[in-house]
Curated annotation (Swiss-Prot):
Protein name according to UniProt: Class I histocompatibility antigen, Non-RT1.A alpha-1 chain
Region entry Alpha-3, spans: 207-298
Cellular localisation: Membrane
Main function: Involved in the presentation of foreign antigens to the immune system.
Bilayer disposition of the protein: Single-pass type I membrane protein
Length: 319
């Protein structure tokens, strides 16, 4: 996305930003495309969503009353009408391309025209703290399965099956990898720098997590300790349970980081421990918003101590 803006303008922008802007950690620009055929119900639906790091900032939906690229972050509302016109034209062109691809894939897989099928695509770039490219990527899937992907060298394609081999042969002839590489190494980085500058109050902030530990008795007689991290941004965080200072990564249950709905994230990690040994276990929380890692233990209240004693007596009587 963004390829229609004058490249000279983007290069000037990158030259201005690069010497003065540095950021903690890496940042990413990613686009997710989904095209779904629906025989008998009209043309395929096409949705494009863009993310800077973990923040959705643009969206296009062909099923909208007036399909247009629209802002999904307040800082994107500063973009002028020319930007939205250009991006809408790009999206409409992509929509037409996916219609053709859906028809081609029917023939590649010898499928009938009566069923619904889905193409998914993810592409983008990551930059380091100095604004230089760390990596670029482009991946395609068909009906939920890997189809074709750009290798790390950004020069060759990895294919999943014979149908994807047909696509690779076409793309090798028309220079698709070279175009993707030029976009990922140049335009993608330039637009990411622009978006980071545009939304720096939101995108470059560091909200530290609030952490605490809860205890949950189990029928087996032991207990689960769950370490919570809430209200943090960006999403990258590390939770590690330790026993007497030794990591317990093999014994932990760890959920994926989840959006909290208010622009921050939440996550938890749990471990099963013997009843009465809770104080030997520590949860270590690492996040860029913290000046140093947090160490959290379960802190029982007086009422909790009484409840655990009753639980122990009940289990002892049962045994």
């Amino acid at each position: 996305m963004g390829a229609m803006a004058p490249r000279t303008l983007l290069l000037l922008l990158a030259a201005v930003l690069a010497p003065t802007q540095t950021w903690a950690g890496s940042h990413s620009l990613r686009y997710f495309h989904t095209a779904v055929s629906r025989p008998g119900l009209g043309e395929p639906r096409f949705i494009s969503v863009g993310y800077v790091d973990d923040t959705q900032f643009v969206r296009y939906d062909s099923d909208a009353e007036n399909p247009r690229y629209e802002p999904r972050a307040r800082w994107m509302e500063r973009e002028g009408p020319e930007y939205w016109e250009e991006q809408t034209l790009v999206a409409k062109g992509q929509e037409l391309d996916y219609r053709v691809s859906l028809r081609n894939l029917l023939s590649y897989y010898n499928q009938s025209e009566g069923g619904s099928h889905t193409i998914q695509r993810m592409y983008g770039c990551d930059v380091g703290s100095d604004g230089s490219l760390l990596r670029g990527y482009e991946q395609h899937a068909y009906d939920g399965r890997d189809y074709i992907a750009l290798n790390e060298d950004l020069k060759t394609w990895a294919v999943a099956d014979f149908a994807a081999w047909i696509t690779r042969s076409k793309w090798q002839r028309n220079g698709a990898a070279e175009r993707s590489r030029a976009y990922l190494e140049g335009t993608c980085v330039e637009w990411l720098l622009r978006y980071l500058e545009r939304g720096k109050e939101t995108l470059l902030r560091s909200d530290p997590p609030e952490a605490h530990v809860t205890l949950h008795p189990r029928p087996e007689g032991d207990v689960t300790l769950r370490c919570w991290a809430l209200g943090f941004y960006p999403a990258d965080i590390t939770l590690t349970w330790q026993l007497n200072g030794e990591d317990l990564t093999q014994d932990m249950e760890l959920v994926e980081t989840r959006p909290a709905g208010d622009g921050t994230f939440q996550k938890w990690a749990s471990v099963v421990v013997p009843l009465g040994k809770e104080q030997n276990y520590t949860c270590r929380v690492e996040h860029e918003g913290l000046p140093e890692p947090l160490s959290q233990r379960w802190e029982p209240s007086p009422s909790t101590d009484s409840n655990l004693l009753l639980l122990f007596l009940e289990l002892w009587q049962f045994l």
